[in-house]
Amino acid sequence: MQDSIEQYMQAVGQQARKASRVLSSASTHTKNNALSAIYTALVNHEPEILAANAVDMQKGRDSHLDSALLDRLELTPTRFKGMLQGLKDVIALTDPIGEITDLAYRPSGIQLGKMRVPLGVIGMIYESRPNVTLEAASLALKSGNAIILRGGSEALQSNKAIATAIQHGLKVAGLPEHAIQVIETADRAAVGQLITMTEYVDVIVPRGGKSLIERISNEARIPVIKHLDGNCHVFIDVEADLHKALPIALNAKTHRYGVCNAMETLLVHEEIAEEFLPRIAELYAEKHVELRGCQETRRILGSSVKTATEEDWYTEYLAPILAIKVVEHIDQAIEHINKYGSHHTDAIVTENYSKVRKFLAEVDSSSVMINASTRFADGFEYGLGAEIGISTDKIHARGPVGLEGLTSQKWIVFGDGQIRH
Amino acid sequence: MQDSIEQYMQAVGQQARKASRVLSSASTHTKNNALSAIYTALVNHEPEILAANAVDMQKGRDSHLDSALLDRLELTPTRFKGMLQGLKDVIALTDPIGEITDLAYRPSGIQLGKMRVPLGVIGMIYESRPNVTLEAASLALKSGNAIILRGGSEALQSNKAIATAIQHGLKVAGLPEHAIQVIETADRAAVGQLITMTEYVDVIVPRGGKSLIERISNEARIPVIKHLDGNCHVFIDVEADLHKALPIALNAKTHRYGVCNAMETLLVHEEIAEEFLPRIAELYAEKHVELRGCQETRRILGSSVKTATEEDWYTEYLAPILAIKVVEHIDQAIEHINKYGSHHTDAIVTENYSKVRKFLAEVDSSSVMINASTRFADGFEYGLGAEIGISTDKIHARGPVGLEGLTSQKWIVFGDGQIRH
């Protein structure tokens, strides 16, 4: 079995590599044609796709998947419409491939510039949500990359049905069918193969729980664009405008709980804590947010607030729970963020110019915000179109990753016969 | 021993991480001050450094190091001057850190942009040449990164002497001495530690032979900016201007042999081969370049030309040897380059507009050149100032890597109290 999985994955890899060569020089027109044909095929195949999803859902219920997972797995007609809209958005995006920038003459007489090119073959590993299949496939196609998709086994029928529509679209546009491949085995060995086929795969994008991503990062022999966790902070400075601070602190925590850009720890300057904390606590109480505070927070808000432990500062709750710490000054806030945070998204609320500059320069996170809710850190809000993930790495892509994160730049040189002396 | 190496390296890593936090927000003025102080210290320490190098050289001769290695190891007064000039060049470079680009308003009212930041801690692994110690240290410092340097054991005394001058310079400028650390053990286990300390090191830059780099890439748990090999091509199209083609083909092969951007295979369009090959062969003969040709090449040039085997197409000779293949058309040339090449640097010589566009779009190499010698692919010629390496990867940095390759961009958001709806 192990052998046959290896053979299967090697074949998938070879086909992807071959298809990627065609895709890399496909015109914008051809790629958009394929995406439009996929759109039409999806509309035509909607009943089959929803039926396949119903099979996955029934199997999921039979095997007692937890309700959050079942929720993510489900494709309703509304979600299906959302998927189609996402696809339309990708068609509307500017094709990044072939863009030439920075063309300038060097003293030798050569003219040097950079040209944007696809990475090649993307390996995508994800859990449950079948809409990721379409999102990832369309972003890969638009950016001239081939993609190998490995969704969760619980979504296999849904993903296969979506893949059928995608294949149909590729065929209509005359692009190789292996440009987008869905792994059709539930065997976990397939993932082990995918993340080590260095000759066939150029980058791995995992999406899912922290344990999945950690496992993949540890075992991959291929660069991984990974998103570990989002332990985000908002720091309310003594010079904060409370008309901004209160809505931001409320929005960053309560707009949605289960998302990576939600605030998990609130930091408050000690000279504003007496005024700010009781007012924000009242707003959190209305939303039933559980507060866990440092000693000073509990002195101000009362001992009904639980004590935050060292562990709390590290925790991404993804729930209506918030840790609160009173700090002496901005340096302590920055130190806390850089030490306990996950380098995802952190914000300061202040009117002070020099503190803005300090916070921007010293907070080591993929998004650093001034007087705005951390909830803005996402591909749509950043105008990237669809988002293939949010990277907490520093190498290659950082923060929300859209089309450009799936590309690279090569150097180009225009000469007139120059030789090196 | 293994334990103590681990403890030693962990301490080195922790200190580097700590120093990197200071460096990341050091001003351009402070960093340049430190570099100038290092310059002065090097000038003052020249006798000690050359004496230390003499010790390494003697030891090298005693242990029968080969002459190429001894040559790379040697620090002559002329080479020392070259090192100092390189340092001056780095001081003159624009500081990339803190650069803010693409600031634009989003529909939500937030203003979004990107800010250039250091990667953090660089691990540099290299062989013999002690000037790399200064080059890498100065580039890291200028770009706000801490660096851990692990040179070859044969250069240990030279590297320690250079490091002493560097430490002195850091001290004068008030920067942490651990910003630049030289590993002082010859134990190979130190490398194993360095490339797996994911919490303390952000990127590994290996420089050396292919086997060293392959070993490091395979074992590293940290992203590697690697340069495997340079199997470069020049394709002489039927529409080539021979006044350009002859000098380029000669220069790309014979300007220097032991460099990664030298041409290793010459591809010639069949309709120009009869005219071009005898003329270029004459020029190569003057330089005593050994030719290995395909069947058609040997038909034209005579059977004194050796037969090129499949193996030859893959080979980076780094020597006065050249493989030659006659191809039917540009597609065959591109296919050959993408299949056998190392995606380093490849050139076409042609006057045809559409072939230029095709070659640029379809050749998958870090540098793609039109009517210019492949020898131009280097950090100095590209105006990057010093070069920390040439990357044959697509992720993060591609081609010659200078200061910018040691940086990353974070997103920054300026708001006025915006929350997400």
Curated annotation (Swiss-Prot), chains A, B:
Pfam families: Aldedh. Pathway: Amino-acid biosynthesis; L-proline biosynthesis; L-glutamate 5-semialdehyde from L-glutamate: step 2/2. Its main location: cytoplasm. It catalyses: L-glutamate 5-semialdehyde + phosphate + NADP(+) = L-glutamyl 5-phosphate + NADPH + H(+). It is found in: Cytoplasm. Catalyzes the NADPH-dependent reduction of L-glutamate 5-phosphate into L-glutamate 5-semialdehyde and phosphate. The product spontaneously undergoes cyclization to form 1-pyrroline-5-carboxylate. This is Gamma-glutamyl phosphate reductase. The gene is proA.
